[in-house]
Amino acid sequence: MKNKKEEKINNLKKEEKINNLKKEEKINNLKKEEKEKNDDVQNKIIDLLEIKLKKSQEKIINMQLKNHEEILKLNYRLNSDIEKSRKFSLEKVIIEFLPIIDNIERALSVIKDKKEAFYLEIINKMNFIFSLLEEILSEFNVSKINEKNISFDPEIHQAMSINYNDEIEDNHVVDVMQSGYMLHKARLLRPAMVIVSKRKNN
């Protein structure tokens, strides 16, 4: 009887031990599943964070590139403005000199045919001054507009009079009353005052 009782107790202990092992295994499995779930969640979070980081880095790189481009554009604009200022800084001074050159030209045209020694000396001195002024203008890239027999260009010519003539094409410069001037072949300092041809039969 005692043996049976012991056997029963032993069986109960075994069963309890088995149950405990099963519970422990179940708990371990649950822990393992929980850990796997946590690992999955962590991996997803890491993936999301990596994507966000990559996007942020791309955004920063794009902003840096944009800023670099803007700096380059600004630098180009500044250099361009400085170059323009340098090129055209003397514009007002040159414009002030033009009437002096005009007056010398007019004076020379009035006395050019005089043969007396007094006039010849004046003509020589005025020619010398005139050539010096032309050299200075040339050094500063000032070009004269005084060509005849070319098409009238309203950008550089100012029509002062019309010459009706069937032998010359319409809208051609017949004569230049006052020379015009350009700075760096880009900026008009003063238009040339010209006489323009027009056919009588038109």
Swiss-Prot record:
User: InterPro entries attached here?
Assistant: GrpE, GrpE_coiled_coil, GrpE_head
Among the entry's GO cellular component annotations, what is one?
cytoplasm
GO biological process entries: protein folding
What's this protein's family per the entry?
Belongs to the GrpE family.
* PANTHER family, alphabetized: GRPE PROTEIN (PTHR21237), GRPE PROTEIN HOMOLOG, MITOCHONDRIAL (PTHR21237:SF23)
Quaternary structure and interacting proteins, as annotated: Homodimer.
Q: What does this protein do?
A: Participates actively in the response to hyperosmotic and heat shock by preventing the aggregation of stress-denatured proteins, in association with DnaK and GrpE. It is the nucleotide exchange factor for DnaK and may function as a thermosensor. Unfolded proteins bind initially to DnaJ; upon interaction with the DnaJ-bound protein, DnaK hydrolyzes its bound ATP, resulting in the formation of a stable complex. GrpE releases ADP from DnaK; ATP binding to DnaK triggers the release of the substrate protein, thus completing the reaction cycle.
The protein in question is named Protein GrpE 1
This chain's source organism reads: Buchnera aphidicola subsp. Schizaphis graminum (strain Sg)
